[in-house]
């Protein structure tokens, strides 16, 4: 583990990877390969140097590939349920929740998140929105949405584990479903720090994303972004 002097206690990376990958159309997305390595393997490799343990929630019938420095648990039927199970599978003080489908994670983003979470208890990687945004109605341009102050949220997201457990417990008690953990913190009226992310942290969701990932991997693997 790479030393992070501003954090006390243990740190764990939690990767909910039990999704079916329907939009990509190639089975469970975490096991799809980019330049000879699965999305999951790339995400684990990017996180492992910064944490004390890596935990992965996998779909039933899909064991953890050999050689990965991680432990696996059975994921839930939703991402939210998988994260809930992962939170109970560790005793770490701080957790980094990361999508396996974001395989290109620069170390600088991780260190910035860990520094921020030591101050605020919750932080997420994010990028200011650069594109023009419009609201559509039945396939037609309706209203322009001002992009000033808008951020596109990425992962990893970093939390004090006790705080994220509290947020998840509140959501479960109220039957509230979410696809984002930082949003559960904000829902309680608590602050979430926005940490500058990286354009390479895009999520592989569609065949077009996969083609882009193949192109990025050629450069990424040659430069070998490392702590």
UniProtKB/Swiss-Prot annotation:
InterPro entries listed in its UniProt record: IspD (IPR001228), IspD/TarI (IPR034683), IspD/TarI_cytidylyltransf_bact (IPR050088), ISPD_synthase_CS (IPR018294), Nucleotide-diphossugar_trans (IPR029044)
PROSITE patterns to which the protein is assigned, alphabetical: ISPD
Pathway(s) this gene product operates in, as recorded in its UniProt entry: Isoprenoid biosynthesis; isopentenyl diphosphate biosynthesis via DXP pathway; isopentenyl diphosphate from 1-deoxy-D-xylulose 5-phosphate: step 2/6
Positions MEP for the nucleophilic attack, annotated site positions: 147, 203
A GO BP annotation: isopentenyl diphosphate biosynthetic process, methylerythritol 4-phosphate pathway
Disulfide bond sites: none
E.C. number(s) listed in UniProt: 2.7.7.60
One Pfam family per UniProt: IspD
Superkingdom per UniProt: Bacteria
Gene Ontology MF terms in the entry: 2-C-methyl-D-erythritol 4-phosphate cytidylyltransferase activity
Reactions performed catalytically: 2-C-methyl-D-erythritol 4-phosphate + CTP + H(+) = 4-CDP-2-C-methyl-D-erythritol + diphosphate
The keyword Signal is annotated on this UniProt entry: no
CDD domains in the record: CDP-ME_synthetase
Broadest EC class assigned to this enzyme: transferase
Site label Transition state stabilizer, positions: 23, 29
Keywords, in A-Z order: Isoprene biosynthesis, Nucleotidyltransferase, Transferase
Annotated PANTHER family: 2-C-METHYL-D-ERYTHRITOL 4-PHOSPHATE CYTIDYLYLTRANSFERASE, CHLOROPLASTIC (PTHR32125:SF4)
Job description of the protein: Catalyzes the formation of 4-diphosphocytidyl-2-C-methyl-D-erythritol from CTP and 2-C-methyl-D-erythritol 4-phosphate (MEP).
Family in the record: Belongs to the IspD/TarI cytidylyltransferase family. IspD subfamily.
Protein name per UniProt: 2-C-methyl-D-erythritol 4-phosphate cytidylyltransferase
Organism of origin: Deinococcus geothermalis (strain DSM 11300 / CIP 105573 / AG-3a)
